[in-house]
Amino acid sequence: MLHKPAGVLTATEDSRQRTVLDLLPPELRKRGLSPVGRLDKDTEGLLLLTNDGALTHRLLSPKSHVDKVYYARTEGTPTEADAARLAQGITLADGLRCLPAELKICGQGQVLLTLREGKFHQAKRMLAFCGTPVVYLKRLSMGPLRLGEDLRPGEFRHLTQEEIDKLQQAVGLVAADCQKNDNNFCKIHKKPLANP
């Protein structure tokens, strides 16, 4: 789990700009890690890095219903009517259909937005649809994973076994579904598989 800072690309490599993998030590960069989804360059918050394609696919699939919660500061404050519209699902001006989302108004120009999909600039576009453009955006959680205050921007940590178990449960994966790599380790949690 990485606390992505603003100003860093959610990419594995870029010849001109810093990427999220540049924040990791060299030994971790060699493991074939990729970000699960994307956060815009100016967005910060929880970003999961893994080398397991099946896990990534399930986490990002709207069919898995994995909630992603964002804290946003906006120009102006959305209304309860805006929250009701987002709860029904909306179609943006360009025809992009967005699944129902939960909008909680936390105060003047402050909201929590819960999405179950991750389309291009979706959080920003949905809040702009409400007439309240985003001035700051941070992902707080993804499924059962929560970004704690102990992880500062640019820092990372390995998931605990409990977090791994909850994440697998959330997307319907079990250890038997893990892909084996050359070291006979589960790509999701790097522990030897039972009875290889």
Predicted regions span which residues?
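Basic, flexible Lys/Arg- and Gly-enriched helix-loop patches that mediate nucleic-acid binding at interfaces
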Residues: M1-P196
